[in-house]
């Protein structure tokens, strides 16, 4: 199942991070992938991490490497739109159970919010999670997802719950900046 392939991405996202290209807006830099046709903003001072298998790209904070953003691309099973996969809450719940906190991972994911947003003529789902890890650790994830040309593109930003207050605006802006050139 396409969502299961996100498991590898999220596992990497919990432990990795990213870097930048062009100067951007308010503490953010711009990254564009001309091959896969997506772009997003990420925090200044983050660097790209090369990862085999899983995410298409990962950036993380050099000082706090568990703070990261990543993009995962998975084929869909014939679904042409996000609505074909379900409502924002349904897709958020599925991603939470299959990718962010899969069975036997020791993690649980609580979907805090799920909304659809339009960017140009495309629909994206913005999903926010509180993730509980073993030993009372908590993380906060915000994701943006779109189905485009038979593939599910998922942008995910993650930080510790303790740093969420400080990182919320930057990571939310990064997630909302994720777009497909279509």
Predicted regions and their residues:
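Short acidic-hydrophobic surface loop/beta-edge motif
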Residues: 29-34, 115-118
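Bacterial signal peptide processing site
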Residues: 22-25
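Proline-anchored loop/turn motifs at beta-strand termini and strand-loop-strand connectors
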Residues: 35-54
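Conserved polar/disulfide-associated segments of primarily extracytoplasmic proteins
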Residues: 49-153
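Soluble non-cytosolic domains of exported or imported proteins
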Residues: 37, 85-90, 161, 165-169
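Surface-exposed amphipathic alpha-helical segments
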Residues: 46, 150-182
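Bacterial N-terminal signal peptides that target proteins for export
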Residues: 1-10
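C-terminal motif of bacterial Sec signal peptides marking the signal peptidase cleavage site
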Residues: 17-20
């Amino acid at each position: 199942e396409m969502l299961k392939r996100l498991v590898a991405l999220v596992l990497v996202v919990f432990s990795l991070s990213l870097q930048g290209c062009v100067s951007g807006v308010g503490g953010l830099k711009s990254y564009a992938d001309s091959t896969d046709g997506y772009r997003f903003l990420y925090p200044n001072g983050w660097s790209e991490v090369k990862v085999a298998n899983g995410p298409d790209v990962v950036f993380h904070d050099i000082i706090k490497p568990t703070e990261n953003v990543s993009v995962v691309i998975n084929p869909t099973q014939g679904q042409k739109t996000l609505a074909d996969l379900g409502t924002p809450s349904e897709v958020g719940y599925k991603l939470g159970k299959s990718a962010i906190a899969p069975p036997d991972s020791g993690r649980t994911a609580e979907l805090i919010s799920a909304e659809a947003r339009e960017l140009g003529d495309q629909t994206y789902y913005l999903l926010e999670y509180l993730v509980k890890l073993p030993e009372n650790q908590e993380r906060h994830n915000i994701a943006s997802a779109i189905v485009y040309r038979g593939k599910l593109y998922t942008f995910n930003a993650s930080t510790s719950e303790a740093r969420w207050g400080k990182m919320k605006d930057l990571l939310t802006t990064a997630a909302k900046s994720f777009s497909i050139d279509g």
